[in-house]
Amino acid sequence: MKRNILAVLIPALLAAGAANAAEIYNKDGNKLDLYGKVKAMRYLSDADSNASNNADKSYTRIGFKGQTLINDQLTGYGQWEYNFSLSNSESSSDAQSGNKTRLGFAGLKLKDYGSVDYGRNYGVIYDVEAFTDMMPEFGATGYTRTDTYMLTRGNSMLTWRNSDFFGLVDGLKIALQYQGKNEGSGTRATNVSNGDGYGASLSYKIVEGLTINGAMSSSNRLNANSASSTTSQKMAAYGSGGRAEAWATGLKYDANGVYLAGTYAETRNTNPFSGASYTFAGNSTATAVSGYANKVQNTELVAQYQFDSGLRPSLAYVQTKAKDIENGIGDADLSKFVDVAATYYFNKNMSAFVDYKVNLLSDSNKLHLNTDDIVAVGLVYQF
């Protein structure tokens, strides 16, 4: 009986991102839930040059969700979530590294008309990415990146969401989003800044277990005060242009213990290069390449099965390719890997996992990007 219950509960936990939250208060239409998790994790790799791929990656997250019933039609709500790194020293300069607010927003929900909230939240492009962000550790590591326009979590998100299309169409969900300007400054880097933008997503449950969705976004890019090619998004030496755009579509099947999903996305002038360099003709050493990809194509596939015993094996493929990079570089993979993983759920609160990222980038890849295979091993307690 316990195993059958696990088979039902675990997919729900994966979709919700947390186990059953602890109810702190529930009285007179006011409710407050506390949730969190501790992830004790280690990366293992034979990396010689990138120590971060062979290191402690443990962290804890804690958050709350609250709501208040204003009247029989209107409900107020809010959510906050914070991440604490567990791999830092207590007193050195790294003590606060990795500690950050992940989510923080408040809003109103008007029955069949949907909800409106504002704050630090997920961008609508992540509505699609969530279909394949299912691996124990290495999910959402292709083209999505925090504080990069509306790809995933970011600041100044004004979001309207509606389920079942005003109560008229079961399974049809829509979202409209506006992101306010977050300009680079002395403390905020250019590659995590954005101009104002808008986006939308649409999701439809075709039949029980089968869902299709799509999303798009378009944002203004910024000029830094110095308006130079190294600090301006619009004038970047690589990936210049006035707007950052993205679209994505996905399909998933989630029923009877089987989870299958695929997503495809394209971006324009959105994704910054990270750790890239290129050996130009006539040079014997590589030169750093800094800027943005003119175009990115991203493909992700995930297959998982939930056994009654609590075991959940996973197989995934991710490829992120930059197109038409300037100065003769052309097309180049930014990420390409197969992910082989397994999670064992002892119960709804405790699990263990191993996640093996098989890096498919060749040692001779154009942008000299990291080619290490990585194994993540960990224990997770969540509530």
From Swiss-Prot:
Signal peptide limits: 1-21
Q: Which GO terms describe its molecular function?
A: porin activity
What's one GO-annotated cellular component? cell outer membrane
Where found in the cell? Cell outer membrane
Periplasmic face residues = 22-30, 71-74, 110-112, 165-171, 207-209, 253-258, 308-310, 347-351
Q: Which GO terms describe its biological process?
A: monoatomic ion transmembrane transport
Instruction: Classify the protein's membrane topology as the record does.
Output: Multi-pass membrane protein
- Could you list this entry's UniProt keywords, alphabetically sorted: Cell outer membrane, Ion transport, Membrane, Porin, Signal, Transmembrane, Transmembrane beta strand, Transport
Question: What CDD domains does the record tag this protein with?
Answer: gram_neg_porins (cd00342)
Top-rank taxon of the source lineage equals Bacteria
Record SUPFAM superfamilies: Porins
Query: In its keyword annotation, does this UniProt entry include ATP-binding?
Result: no
Please list every transmembrane segment annotated in the UniProt record, as residue ranges: 31-45, 59-70, 75-86, 101-109, 113-122, 156-164, 172-178, 199-206, 210-219, 244-252, 259-268, 297-307, 311-319, 336-346, 352-361, 373-383
Extracellular topology ranges: 46-58, 87-100, 123-155, 179-198, 220-243, 269-296, 320-335, 362-372
- Assembly and partners? Homotrimer.
Primary role: May play an important role in maintaining pathogenicity in plants.
Regarding protein family, the annotation reads: Belongs to the Gram-negative porin family.
The protein depicted here goes by the name Outer membrane protein Omp-EA
Which species is this UniProt entry from? Erwinia amylovora (Fire blight bacteria)
Q: Which gene encodes it?
A: omp-EA
